[in-house]
């Protein structure tokens, strides 16, 4: 944090798999007190109780425990909160304090971004959707005549065995249990093209709700329970095949 402050950083992100942890909270408070001019994004959390504590010192909160496409936290530990439910719960606390929420994980489509924003998030954090673009790390791999890029989670074996992983998962001097996997994702080309497509999808979603901005989107959007049948109905169906 001191090095970041010295470099002129105006935002410090406290990024931990389990943000609602005594040591993490204590460290975050100390950093915030020491570097008062810098904004702090704190996470990750998934409950209202965690939000109450975080709102006392954080300028923004990151939500998400186990929803990522390459995250196995919920399988390994049995712990986690469905992402949309977590967003709604944290926002119910953070909104009253004027603290914005960032939805981190579980975003598969522009529709998921729209739902996260509708639930009260001010922004989303993307991994899988941007993985596979030219700008992301990872080698391009050819398989079955198609191109892919390597993609690994922050809880994957190779990451947690690195120095950064040991700091994130408190594994100094002991063997860590991976909470993520390494995989391949389709090669997607320039990130600008992906972002443009996602942005258009969000605009369409806001248009259907009649919202001109995020504030109106938060106010006007409504949620309804759906069944597996309605999920099937909401996708292309009753077709012999889809022409790509």
Give the residues covered by each predicted segment.
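C-terminal extensions of enzymes
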Residues: 170-244
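Catalytic core of tubulin tyrosine ligase-like
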Residues: 149-172, 181-182, 188-189
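Alpha-helical protein-protein interaction elements
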Residues: 140, 161-162, 195, 200
């Amino acid at each position: 944090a001191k090095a970041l402050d010295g470099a002129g950083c105006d935002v410090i992100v406290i990024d931990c798999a389990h943000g609602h942890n005594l040591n993490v909270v204590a460290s975050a408070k100390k950093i915030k007190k020491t570097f008062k001019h810098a904004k702090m994004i704190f996470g990750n959390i998934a409950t209202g109780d965690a939000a109450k504590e975080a709102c006392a010192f954080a300028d923004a909160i990151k939500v998400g425990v186990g929803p990522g496409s390459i995250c196995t936290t919920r399988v390994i530990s049995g712990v986690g909160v469905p992402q949309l439910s977590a967003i709604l719960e944290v926002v119910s606390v953070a909104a009253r304090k004027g603290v914005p929420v960032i939805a981190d994980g579980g975003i598969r489509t522009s529709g998921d971004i729209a739902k996260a924003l509708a639930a009260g998030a001010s922004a989303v954090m993307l991994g899988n959707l941007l993985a596979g673009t030219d700008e992301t790390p990872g080698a391009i791999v050819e398989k079955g005549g198609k191109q892919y890029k390597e993609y690994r989670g922050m809880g994957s074996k190779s990451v947690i065995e690195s120095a950064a992983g040991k700091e994130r998962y408190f594994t100094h001097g002991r063997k860590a249990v991976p909470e993520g996997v390494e995989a391949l994702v389709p090669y997607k080309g320039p990130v600008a093209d992906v972002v443009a497509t996602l942005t258009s999808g969000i605009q369409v979603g806001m248009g259907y709700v009649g919202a001109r901005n995020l504030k109106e989107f938060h106010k006007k959007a409504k949620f309804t329970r759906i069944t597996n049948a309605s999920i099937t109905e909401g996708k292309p169906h009753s077709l012999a095949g889809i022409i790509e």
